[in-house]
């Protein structure tokens, strides 16, 4: 069997609320860290979420 290209990552809120999303990314196609503006329900605003490893 071939090795999978996709890895699971955690998108952590930069508002320091502890809220995070879990998503997948293609590790070979996107070598940099992902950064999105998504909704954080703790602060009830759209904030920047940055990629972190799932431990």
Swiss-Prot record:
The lineage of its organism: Bacteria, Pseudomonadati, Pseudomonadota, Alphaproteobacteria, Acetobacterales. GO terms for cellular component: cytosolic large ribosomal subunit. SUPFAM superfamilies: Zn-binding ribosomal proteins. It holds the Pfam family Ribosomal_L33. Coiled coil: none annotated. The keyword Thylakoid does not apply. This is Large ribosomal subunit protein bL33. HAMAP family: Ribosomal_bL33. It comes from Granulibacter bethesdensis (strain ATCC BAA-1260 / CGDNIH1). Keywords: Ribonucleoprotein, Ribosomal protein. One of its GO terms (biological process) is translation. One of its GO terms (molecular function) is structural constituent of ribosome. InterPro entries: Ribosomal_bL33 (IPR001705), Ribosomal_bL33_CS (IPR018264), Ribosomal_bL33_sf (IPR038584), Ribosomal_zn-bd (IPR011332). The keyword Oxidoreductase does not apply. It comes from the Bacteria. Belongs to the bacterial ribosomal protein bL33 family.
């Amino acid at each position: 069997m071939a090795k999978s290209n996709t890895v699971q990552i955690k998108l952590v809120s930069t508002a320091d609320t502890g809220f995070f999303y879990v998503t997948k990314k293609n590790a070979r196609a996107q070598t940099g860290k992902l950064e999105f503006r998504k909704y954080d329900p703790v602060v009830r605003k759209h904030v920047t979420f940055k990629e972190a490893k799932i431990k």
